[in-house]
Regions:
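Conserved short strand/loop->alpha-helix "switch" segment adjacent to the catalytic nucleotide/phosphoryl-transfer site
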Residues: 22-37
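Short conserved segment of the HATPase_c
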Residues: 78-98
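Conserved small/polar residues in nucleotide/adenosyl-binding loops
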Residues: 413-420
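Alpha-helix capping/hinge segments and adjacent helical runs
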Residues: 16-17
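Hydrophobic alpha-helical segments, chiefly the membrane-spanning helices
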Residues: 424-430
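Short acidic, Gly/Ser-rich segments with clustered Asp/Glu that frequently serve as metal-coordination loops
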Residues: 74
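GHKL-family ATPase ATP-binding module
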Residues: 1-10, 33, 38, 46-49, ...
């Protein structure tokens, strides 16, 4: 029962990892532990993006632990000058602690909030970290986010043998199910390998014999689109694959179109290799660039029927595409990073997409007209549906009393006659 009094004594201050334990849904997806794996994986991928990692391994262990290992530089083990604890302990136990705020250590990265792995620690029964760095091997462990053992050296390794291994066991009380969604995880791992050419990712499900996979791509997006669209009819024999770079931003995309619903719909967007399921600035910029280039192409070649206007959805509805953006200091909508809110990046993507597609369309006019035809058909269908809805509203008018009801027959809208206005619902006994 709530107290009537409200004074300073009622104010609570959550410290350490308590905010995560109190409101886990604000920091991760609590439907299953997949997002915890992604948080650890993203740290390893950030090492790969910076050129310090070429191998990542993920294992689902028989005892319920999940292990993510990389051959990056290894988490810092020296003492932090201000907080007086090792770098690895600070990263695992303190929210908003990390080396990715300034951009000095990572040009492009996804772990920008300094929250990810500390959330994993907070929501795990047990977590163990092994670091190989400076010819030494170190270990530290945690229980429910609290340090269980101090960082200690446990061995020596070769100078070039570096990396970080994090093994954790998700606490089931924080999740709807503690089962990892393996299909979704594999899709994510494959996409990471595609978006970071030269990176090898190994997956091993120890709970199921023979469930092992390795992903390695040299030509990235092109291979990914070809594999993902297997079994679907495509308009273009060769997909459009492009890349643009500036000092602080990069854009890569691959796109093709299908004249009928594809077997597997591909409409994926990524920022610094993090999947943005809700799109955001980069997707909006991409759609804008596609629309502007195709509209200009159609207008120049007089392809549009009089009075018909195409929109971005008309252009992209029949498309299979993957968009990968990289930028410094991206602004995400929340910790789960499902939507990008970096407004400046939208104009970068839009202008570059338009330039690339405009050149392509005007050098591949026959294929360009096929793409335009799909957009025009979509726009015409949309216009017909809109007209039906508007006519329906016009005919509907005020609600009719008693047994009289509005006629909902398509005939009313296609070929109305004076007799087709009202239908009388008669009782079955009449």
């Amino acid at each position: 029962m709530a107290k009537n009094s409200y004074d300073a004594e009622a104010i609570e201050v959550l410290s350490g990892l308590d905010p995560v334990k109190k409101r886990p849904g604000m920091y991760t997806d609590t439907s299953n532990p997949n997002h915890l794996i992604q948080e650890v994986l993203d740290n390893s991928v950030d090492e790969a993006l910076s050129g310090h990692c070429s191998n990542i391994k993920i294992a689902l262990m028989k005892d319920g632990f999940i292990k993510v290992s990389d051959d990056g530089r290894g988490m810092p083990v020296d003492e932090h000058p201000e907080h007086k604890v090792s770098g690895v302990e600070l990263i695992l136990c303190k929210l908003h602690a990390g080396a990715k705020f300034s951009g000095d250590d990572y040009n492009f990265s996804g772990g920008l909030h300094g929250v990810g792995v500390s959330v994993v620690n907070a929501l795990s029964d047990e977590l163990e970290v092994t670091v190989k760095r400076d010819s030494k091997e170190y270990e530290i462990s945690f229980n429910n986010g609290d340090k269980a053992s101090d960082l200690k050296q446990v061995g020596e390794v070769g100078l070039r043998n570096t990396g970080t291994s994090i093994k954790f066991k998700p606490n089931p009380k924080y999740f709807e199910t503690n089962e990892v969604q393996i299909k979704n995880l594999k899709h994510l791992l494959r996409a990471k390998a595609v978006l970071c050419p030269g990176l090898t990712i190994d997956f091993n499900n120890e709970k199921k014999s023979g469930d092992k996979e390795r992903w390695f791509f040299e030509d990235g997006l092109k291979s990914y689109l070809v594999e993902s669209s297997e079994g679907s009819e495509l308009v273009l024999e060769d997909s459009i694959v492009c890349s643009k770079k500036s000092d602080a931003q990069e854009l890569e995309f691959a796109i093709n179109w299908s004249p009928r619903p594809p077997k597997n719909k591909l409409d994926e967007t990524y920022v610094n290799l993090i999947p943005t399921l809700q799109g955001g600035s980069h997707l909006n910029g991409f759609k804008s660039g596609l629309l502007d280039s195709l509209k200009e192409f159609c207008e120049y070649r007089n392809l549009l029927p009089k009075g018909l206007k195409i929109n971005a959805d008309d252009v992209i509805n029949s498309a299979l595409f993957i968009v990968s953006s990289k930028l410094q200091n991206p602004q995400f909508a929340g910790q789960t990073k499902e939507r990008l809110d970096s407004k400046d990046h939208m104009s970068f993507v839009a202008s570059n997409t338009k330039d690339i597609l405009s050149i392509w369309l005007n050098t591949h006019t026959e294929e360009g007209e096929k793409i335009a035809e799909l957009a025009i058909i979509s726009a015409q269908t949309r216009a017909k549906v809109s007209n039906i809805v508007e006519r329906k509203k016009t005919f509907k008018g005020p609600a009719l009393p008693g047994k009289l009801s509005d006629c909902n027959s398509c005939l009313l809208y296609t070929s109305p006659s004076p007799r087709d206005g009202l239908l009388s619902r008669m009782p079955s006994s009449a």
